[in-house]
């Protein structure tokens, strides 16, 4: 192994250790023709870290969807700066606002779920008292328990939109862009909450240009101030929305696995690809389109 190869493997292992300490799953680095590479998985998808070796030295590259929260967090860990900066990233929690979040956008199987929750100063305290925090810090069992508590809180105003894979595929074909679909769904959830309770602000996690949400908002929605920020789950209403969305997503898997006697894996891993091949070959393409988001690269491998 050359000196450049040795420095490259040392470099990628150092990065992977740092990434794992932040709670992400990583694969073991493998050697390709000109680089060492490893996969990184998060809740909203997967990306790849590559460290190239040549006579000129080493080059680090992060490969994947730049709009994924996973990509932005890992980019920050490696390069020490945020890929996207936003004046809204330092906003304080408003007195009353709507928080939105989604679950399932990085998973081949399952629905895309978007939830919106209204809160004010007093209700924020109630949400915190029942354990509301970022759903990524909670087990599936805890998510189910806290989601139930959120729904039972007196005066809780929320909306959950679960887009089944079959409906998702129709909408994606129509819109041709995941961010447009996300924008439409977030806007719909915000509008549904506004029909029950007026609010002047809304906060969502940053997944793309604000225009994707604004362009889909109706009359009431266009009057609010929208903040799209990274790590938006630090805001209580967004954290509550993330729990409701994740709970709906998990329940879909429990229901479908029981009804169809399938153990559908989450994410977009090799296991997912193997299960998708089984479904297509044994149950048919019509069944697959009712269970999976077909625009994923996984479909092309089947």
What label would you give each PLM region?
Residues 1-98, 102-302:
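RNase H-like, Mg2+-dependent phosphodiesterase core
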């Amino acid at each position: 192994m050359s000196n450049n190869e040795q420095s490259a493997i040392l470099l990628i292992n150092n990065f992977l250790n740092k990434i794992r300490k932040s709670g992400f799953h990583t694969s073991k680095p493998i050697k390709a023709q000109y680089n060492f590479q490893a996969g990184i998985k998060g809740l909203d998808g997967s990306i790849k870290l590559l460290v190239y070796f040549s006579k000129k030295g080493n080059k680090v590259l992060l490969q994947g969807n730049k709009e994924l929260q996973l990509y932005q967090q890992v980019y920050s860990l490696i390069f020490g700066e945020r890929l996207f900066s936003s004046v809204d990233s330092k906003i304080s929690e408003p007195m009353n606002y709507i928080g939105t979040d989604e679950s399932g956008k990085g998973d081949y199987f399952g629905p895309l779920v978007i939830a919106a929750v209204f809160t004010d100063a007093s209700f924020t305290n109630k949400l915190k008292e029942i354990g509301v925090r970022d759903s990524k810090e909670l087990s599936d069992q805890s998510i189910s328990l806290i989601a139930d508590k959120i729904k039972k809180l007196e005066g809780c105003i929320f909306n959950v939109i679960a887009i089944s894979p079959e409906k998702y595929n129709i909408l994606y074909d129509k819109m041709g862009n995941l961010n447009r679909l996300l924008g439409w769904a977030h806007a719909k959830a915000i509008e549904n909450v506004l029909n029950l309770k007026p609010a002047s602000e809304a906060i969502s996690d940053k997944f793309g240009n604000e225009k994707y949400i604004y362009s889909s908002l109706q009359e009431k929605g266009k009057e609010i101030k929208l903040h799209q920020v990274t790590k938006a789950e630090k805001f209580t209403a967004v954290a509550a929305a993330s729990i409701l969305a994740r709970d709906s997503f998990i329940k879909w898997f429990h229901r479908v696995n029981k009804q169809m006697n399938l153990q559908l894996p989450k994410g977009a891993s090799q296991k997912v690809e193997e299960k998708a091949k089984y479904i297509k070959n044994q149950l048919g393409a019509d069944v697959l389109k009712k269970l999976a988001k077909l625009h994923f690269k996984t479909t092309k491998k089947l």
